[in-house]
């Protein structure tokens, strides 16, 4: 429980009261005596100090520290301190002379002592003042002059043909001969002098194999777009212009072309009516986003309103989520599929690629029961692969021999003589069949009639 006791206000000091009430003459006596030092204690100190002088003992209204040197007993005198003797093997240093500084001397004292200049490095060369030495020769003849006649220039050309088919690239070709004079033209791929050096090369292989036996694919979390929070006002837009040119719903002006995929900024006057009332006071329209909400594809943009102005000129307002549903997401169609289940009986399985000689003839000529509308028959040799059977619905028909596949040839049974009626309803025509051709009986040939010519 919090106490409801009022706080105690600090009282003004005596000095503050004296400054405010002295001019009005309403100061209390104790405040005036304390500030003006006219109390009884102050008067005793003033009268006593006229006849008694205590010096620097510190006796007074201050702290009783006994002055700078402290309290010293009056009956005891000072004690002499014997000088310290030095060890016999220690040599005392000469005393340091202290230079006194007169009041007229400069206040800045140089601490750098003057020292002699020491020259370092090699000594400077000494130039002789006397003349140089003279050269004497035993001969007095004229010096010999060699006559070097100019000769014709000889051009030496050396060409090396490099055939990569018959030359090993690792073999270093010899350097062509070099003459003292002339021009040398060398044609080769490369020249290596000295022993060849083998540099180990590392193969850079990008390993895409997993580093662990059970790798977990790293799926980066997609940023969550908070478009449906309580801080955003939800406004549905029906006009399709919102998707192509949203600036037409905010301002009547024709601004310079802006990329609608980026954030749009609008500078509107204080009094402005937007073409669409839903976009009133919109100063910023952020970039679009495609989301899915309750089975539909939704086109969304977040806008910032500038409803109020602050004293500094800043516009503040709420945030709005404008959205338009594009199209619904159709649910997936369900297709009824028949399960492919193998027969529990292994004797009903048959491999269509098995050898026909290994199949029992009793199975080949087995018949199908007429009373069963749907039957499954297949053959199964022991060494063949297990294959799932297939159910085929059959109608009620006479007995039929089973054919298991197109790759199996069964023996055919010869058919009997077709039945002919005893008394045919139409006369039979005799046809003689001989080989691949036939002809009618000459008795059935019609005679050629002569065409009569009528005279007019």
Curated annotation (Swiss-Prot):
Q: What is its main location?
A: virion
PTM (free text): Highly phosphorylated.
Short sequence motif Nuclear localization signal: positions: 1-12, 446-454
Q: Where in the cell is it found?
A: Virion; Host nucleus; Host early endosome; Host Golgi apparatus
Q: Which GO terms describe its molecular function?
A: DNA binding; structural molecule activity
Report whether Coiled coil shows up as a keyword of the record: no
Q: Name one GO cellular component term.
A: host cell nucleus
Q: Does the keyword DNA-binding apply?
A: yes
Q: Cite the record's note on assembly.
A: Interacts with major capsid protein L1. Interacts with E2; this interaction inhibits E2 transcriptional activity but not the DNA replication function E2. Interacts with host GADD45GIP1. Interacts with host HSPA8; this interaction is required for L2 nuclear translocation. Interacts with host importins KPNB2 and KPNB3. Forms a complex with importin alpha2-beta1 heterodimers via interaction with the importin alpha2 adapter. Interacts with host DYNLT1; this interaction is essential for virus intracellular transport during entry.
Put simply, this protein is called Minor capsid protein L2
């Amino acid at each position: 429980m919090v106490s409801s006791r009022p706080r105690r206000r600090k009282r003004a000091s005596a000095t503050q009261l004296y400054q405010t009430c002295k001019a009005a003459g309403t100061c209390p006596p104790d405040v005036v005596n304390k500030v003006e030092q006219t109390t009884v204690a102050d008067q005793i100190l003033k009268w006593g100090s006229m006849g008694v002088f205590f010096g620097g003992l510190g006796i007074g209204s201050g702290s009783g520290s006994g002055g700078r040197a402290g309290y010293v007993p009056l009956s005891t005198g000072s004690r002499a301190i014997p000088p310290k003797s030095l060890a016999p093997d220690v040599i005392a240093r000469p005393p340091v002379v202290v230079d006194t500084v007169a009041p007229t001397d400069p206040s800045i004292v140089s601490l750098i002592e003057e020292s002699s200049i020491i020259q370092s490095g090699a000594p400077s060369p000494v130039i002789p003042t006397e003349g140089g030495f003279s050269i004497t020769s035993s001969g007095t003849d004229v010096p010999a002059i060699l006559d070097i006649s100019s000769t014709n220039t000889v051009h030496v050309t050396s060409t090396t043909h490099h055939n990569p088919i018959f030359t090993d690239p690792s073999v270093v070709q010899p350097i062509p001969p070099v003459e003292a004079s002339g021009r040398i033209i060398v044609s080769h791929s490369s020249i290596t002098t000295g022993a060849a050096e083998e540099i180990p090369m590392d193969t850079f292989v990008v390993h895409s194999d997993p580093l662990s036996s059970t790798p977990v694919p790293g799926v980066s979390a997609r940023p969550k777009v908070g478009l449906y929070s309580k801080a955003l006002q939800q406004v549905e837009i029906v006009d399709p212009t919102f998707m192509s040119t949203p600036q037409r719903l905010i301002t009547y002006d024709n601004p310079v072309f802006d990329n609608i995929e980026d954030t749009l900024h609008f500078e509107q006057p204080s009094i402005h009516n937007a073409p669409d009332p839903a976009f009133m006071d919109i100063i910023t329209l952020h970039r679009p986003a495609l989301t899915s909400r309750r089975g539909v594809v939704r086109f969304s943009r977040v806008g910032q309103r500038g409803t109020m102005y602050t004293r500094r000129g800043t516009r503040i307002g709420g945030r709005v989520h404008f959205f338009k549903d594009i199209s619904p997401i159709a649910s997936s169609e369900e297709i009824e599929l028949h399960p492919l289940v193998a027969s529990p009986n292994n004797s009903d399985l048959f491999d269509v690629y098995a050898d026909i000689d290994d199949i029992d003839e009793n199975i080949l000529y087995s018949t199908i029961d007429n009373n069963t509308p749907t039957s499954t028959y297949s053959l199964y040799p022991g060494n063949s692969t297990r294959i799932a059977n297939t159910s085929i619905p059959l109608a009620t028909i006479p007995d039929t021999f089973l054919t298991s596949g197109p790759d199996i040839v069964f023996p055919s049974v010869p058919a009997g003589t077709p039945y002919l009626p005893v008394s045919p309803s139409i006369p039979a025509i005799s046809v003689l069949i001989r080989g691949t051709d036939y002809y009618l009986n000459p008795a059935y040939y019609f005679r050629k009639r002569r065409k009569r010519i009528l005279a007019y």
